[in-house]
From Swiss-Prot:
The keyword Transmembrane helix does not apply. It holds the Pfam family Voldacs. The lineage of its organism: Eukaryota, Metazoa, Ecdysozoa, Arthropoda, Hexapoda. Keywords: Chaperone, Cytoplasm, Cytoskeleton, mRNA processing, mRNA splicing, Nucleus. The keyword Cytoplasm applies. This is Methylosome subunit pICln. Component of the methylosome, a 20S complex containing at least CLNS1A/pICln, PRMT5/SKB1 and WDR77/MEP50; may mediate SNRPD1 and SNRPD3 methylation. Forms a 6S pICln-Sm complex composed of CLNS1A/pICln, SNRPD1, SNRPD2, SNRPE, SNRPF and SNRPG; ring-like structure where CLNS1A/pICln mimics additional Sm proteins and which is unable to assemble into the core snRNP. GO terms for cellular component: cytoskeleton; cytosol; methylosome; pICln-Sm protein complex; plasma membrane; spliceosomal complex. InterPro entries: ICln (IPR003521), ICln/Lot5/Saf5 (IPR039924), PH-like_dom_sf (IPR011993). Belongs to the pICln (TC 1.A.47) family.
Amino acid sequence: MVLIMRVSPPEHGLLYTANNIKLKLGDKVVGEGTVYIAQNTLSWQPTELAEGISIEWKQVSLHGISSNPRKCIYFMLDHKVEWNGVYGDPPQQAVNGRNGGGSEAEVDEGNGSDEHDEDDNFEDAVDEQFGEVTECWLMPEDIHTVDTMYSAMTTCQALHPDSANSDSEDSDPMQDAGGLEDEAMEEDDALTLGRNGVQNLSLDDDEERFEDADE
């Protein structure tokens, strides 16, 4: 769950807090504020807004250290954040819309090539995929604190494993192996297709996975 609310310091389980931390959502820098990295939530309260944001760890799809525009924390939420007056656009019509795409642009059946249609469908799928997530950056004034923030986030997220990836007694080992490969491909796609330096994201889990594969 992601809540837009007045954020107070957690009473229990606080691992890290710091002031002068900028939060960037998508292409927008929301402002500067205080971050609270706790066992159950990742929260940020801006200094110039009444409300902040509180995020349960299960909503964080991945996190790591980015170097663009400078060393900072990058993390991705598994859905689109709507923060009234701050971030998030209302749903837009039509997605085939380089020109605002109306129905007339989609009626050209039989005259266009199948290859062109497949390209359009792929681009629409990519747009839809990234429309369902929110890319976020925590940018501290002191970049030397990034490693400490990353360590605290890793510790907290490890306390909340994704239930969808948990082992099952009825699971098929071959299917499980395929699932791991699919997950790796999805993460690679996210790193490749992401914006604003996401391709520079360093994830320890990925590095260990590839090292194990080499062995």
